[in-house]
């Protein structure tokens, strides 16, 4: 019998103790935390949205069954702690995950939280509920979930078709919040109700999202803040000025602009961290001429990743594959292994020469170039690398014209594959292969924007997912990485490192190294003023 995950390791118990009761260090209650948001979310429906902006703004409204410790920088199985669940245990065969639940927790409208709410949530996510989600971007996470059953009001069991040791990590994602049975998905888009530390007040599109303290929160003494306001400022330079003027307390900025912040406000605390977001080339494999494998590979081999990093990340980005690069990423490949992948050879001219040869065999050349639209989302983290991509594709006889898509239309457009090629950002709700592979590369997944489908490789997805030995699993993951690169499934360009700054009075908020959303519960954050 393969080893099964323990109910809760000693490390998990220690982390749980930390999360449940951070030692008092003269935390001051009260105050309004003003957080910069880079875009206006389509809604605050956590189960339906895919972007970081709604996730960041809404995570504090909800609770998970389990979550990643808010004060451990790297998300991993070892940093998962209880939340609405008080613990978890696996059956001997590794197919049943049972979680006892906290008693006495209330929804923001005063109704009791029970195991029925957990079942309702995952029935929604798997399409079994009578009501349906408008979008279900994470349905692919739960392809191995057969059923969810309840044992009274205070216990729930997830029944799996096969062992999946990392299933708990999917439940810990900031996206894996629990919804109330008694509130419809449509109402959750307009006025989300949770059990979390903050209650929803209002959402003014393109202006702000406002949350207020939940006075009946089940974690005694939390949250410290009276309210949180997410100020929507799309232009990074404008956001910088607002931060320097003290109008916002926390901002996501660029590395060059961070230097201006430190110069103008030297007491500011700034941190550069990766966060696990890749810039990648999406190619509609069903749209000629991109249904040709050599065409897709030629485009992948044209990429000068170092130039992207130098321009966009001030030289501080990372080169990697599907999984976030080491050391911040848990499952990334060593650099010497990455260099062996197609298009990753450090000899750029060799790569491009081979790519031009492929294109010429397809009938393209200096006198017969391919003209097309390159789509991307209308915010700087997408637009800026898209301009560089268009310039680099010229090296392989492709002339691109930038087509800008507003945020509200971006995800629906790429989900229905209404494009030829595009510049995309992909972030994982979890730094785990089960999330990345099934969500972005499995046949029929809503977020498989390129239409990639390889049933034989999916069998390998299942093998790595069921493997309990971490070393053996990594070897399978890297084998999958090689095949995805060879197939040009979704060429990864580079991983950015983001710059985050906060005012010195903001205390007890940890930026995570392999997630940009999982640290936004904010129940432990306080203001020293």
Protein language model annotation of sequence segments:
Residues 100, 119, 135-181:
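Surface-exposed binding/hinge segments that line
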Residues 260-263, 286, 290-333, 352, ...:
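Periplasmic-binding protein-like
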Residues 67-75, 164-223, 227, 234-237, ...:
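Gly/Pro-rich hinge or "lid" segments in bacterial periplasmic/extracellular proteins
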Residues 36-92, 123, 191-195:
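N-terminal lobe/hinge region of extracytoplasmic solute-binding protein
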Residues 132-135, 148, 201-212, 229-287, ...:
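Extracellular/periplasmic solute-recognition and catalytic clefts
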Residues 102, 186, 215-261, 297, ...:
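Ligand-site clamp/hinge motif
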Residues 319-361, 379-384:
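Structural transition elements
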Residues 95, 342, 346-349, 399-410, ...:
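Extracytoplasmic/peripheral linker and loop segments enriched in polar/acidic and small residues
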